[in-house]
């Protein structure tokens, strides 16, 4: 079932959370709402779910207006960041909960509930944990159980609010790949909120970039990465170098460069900024030689040694030691303004 929002606006006091937002999501599509904190992505998700009402605009499911439909009637599966499992219920009882609280006229028989819950636990590959309690599960297992519970009521759409935000990095990566595979089996319209750029680009069919209550760009991961529509999108999706210059009659000049800019063919001495990602630079042989052999002159200031656990033995540097820093060769094409790079320190032997 498709989801469509038209001209949604929402204020909380003087704060404008959403400003004339419109979006269409097809059945079977997995869409990421991506943006910084306070951009409106969670508010948009909650309005789609019926947990929040908009000041203006409408929400449509499969072309039918659902704006005024109660949350209990929308048939939406919702997964929260912090699982929201019932601590006093077993895994089986948590997944069965939505089925057992249905109105008597819609409630399945106990045999049907048993079969459905075991099928769902098998789907999320945790049927062997049916008799455990949430406190006995890992964070990743709890999140998969929360997803099984959301699917138990056969939702028309699936909404996930930062579903992996409370998990450690390794588990988060494993679960998001698992979610992608699972979603392909379900064929429902799914929307998930995240502030993790890598997560959105890896998992989603399309990415919706949001900022200050507005949609900045909608596109496939490749489209938003290779063709950012605004400076915000460029900056939010990764490191970028900003080169200030002037555009005139389809040519941009700045930073000692002259580049064709056909989209600015009508410009006359207009200030313009060129955006270049670090990996897009090509270095001449002379520049590569400079990068490979660039060293700092000796310094005589106090420095501190910072090291990883894989280097258990580190010699502390004293004031009289001379320090030389150089870039690793593998990093020579990953420079960006304000970024960081590894350095090799070698105290001069006395």
UniProtKB/Swiss-Prot annotation:
It catalyses: sulfate(out) + ATP + H2O = sulfate(in) + ADP + phosphate + H(+); thiosulfate(out) + ATP + H2O = thiosulfate(in) + ADP + phosphate + H(+). GO terms for molecular function: ABC-type sulfate transporter activity; ABC-type thiosulfate transporter activity; ATP binding; ATP hydrolysis activity. It holds the Pfam family ABC_tran. Residues 3-237 form the ABC transporter domain. It is found in: Mitochondrion. ATP binds at residues 35-42. The keyword Cell division does not apply. Its EC number is 7.3.2.3. Keywords: ATP-binding, Mitochondrion, Nucleotide-binding, Plasmid, Sulfate transport, Translocase, Transport. PROSITE patterns: ABC_TRANSPORTER_1 (PS00211), ABC_TRANSPORTER_2 (PS50893), CYSA (PS51237). CDD domains: ABC_CysA_sulfate_importer. One of its GO terms (cellular component) is ATP-binding cassette (ABC) transporter complex. It is an enzyme of class 7 (translocase). The keyword ATP-binding applies. InterPro entries: AAA+_ATPase (IPR003593), ABC_SmlMolc_Importer (IPR050093), ABC_transporter-like_ATP-bd (IPR003439), ABC_transporter-like_CS (IPR017871), CysA_C (IPR041193), P-loop_NTPase (IPR027417), Sulph_transpt1 (IPR005666). Part of the ABC transporter complex involved in sulfate/thiosulfate import. Responsible for energy coupling to the transport system. Belongs to the ABC transporter superfamily. Sulfate/tungstate importer (TC 3.A.1.6) family. PANTHER family: SPERMIDINE/PUTRESCINE IMPORT ATP-BINDING PROTEIN POTA, SPERMIDINE_PUTRESCINE IMPORT ATP-BINDING PROTEIN POTA. This is Sulfate/thiosulfate import ATP-binding protein cysA.
């Amino acid at each position: 079932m498709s989801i469509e929002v038209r001209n949604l606006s929402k204020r909380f006091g003087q704060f404008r959370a959403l400003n004339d937002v419109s979006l269409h999501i097809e059945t079977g599509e997995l869409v990421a709402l991506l943006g910084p904190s306070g951009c409106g992505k969670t508010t948009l998700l909650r309005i789609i779910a019926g947990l929040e009402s908009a000041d203006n605009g409408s929400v449509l499911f499969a072309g039918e207006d659902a704006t005024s439909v109660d949350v209990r009637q929308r048939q939406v599966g919702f997964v929260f960041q912090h699982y929201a499992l019932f601590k006093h219920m077993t895994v089986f009882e948590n997944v069965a909960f939505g089925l057992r609280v249905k109105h008597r006229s819609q409630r399945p028989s106990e045999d049907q509930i048993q079969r459905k819950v075991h099928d769902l636990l098998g789907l999320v590959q945790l049927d062997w944990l049916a008799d455990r309690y949430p406190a006995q599960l890992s964070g990743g297992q709890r999140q998969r159980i929360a997803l099984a519970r959301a699917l138990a009521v056969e939702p028309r759409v699936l909404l996930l609010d930062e579903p992996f935000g409370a998990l450690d990095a390794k588990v988060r990566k494993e679960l998001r790949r698992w979610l992608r595979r699972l979603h392909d089996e379900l064929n429902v319209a799914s929307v998930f909120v995240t502030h993790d750029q890598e997560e959105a680009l890896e998992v989603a069919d399309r990415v919706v970039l949001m900022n200050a209550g507005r949609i900045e760009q909608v596109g496939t991961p490749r489209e938003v990465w290779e063709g950012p529509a605004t400076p915000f999108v460029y900056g939010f999706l990764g490191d970028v170098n900003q080169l200030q210059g002037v555009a005139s009659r389809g040519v941009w000049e700045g930073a000692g460069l002259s580049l064709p800019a056909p989209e600015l063919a009508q410009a006359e001495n207009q200030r313009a900024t060129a955006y270049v990602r670090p990996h897009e630079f090509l270095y001449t042989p002379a520049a590569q030689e400079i990068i490979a052999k660039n060293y700092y002159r000796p310094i005589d200031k106090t420095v501190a040694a910072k090291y990883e656990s894989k280097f258990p033995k580190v010699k502390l540097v004293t004031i009289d030691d001379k320090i030389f820093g150089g870039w690793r060769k593998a990093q020579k094409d990953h420079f960006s303004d304000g970024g960081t790079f590894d350095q090799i320190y070698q105290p001069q032997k006395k």
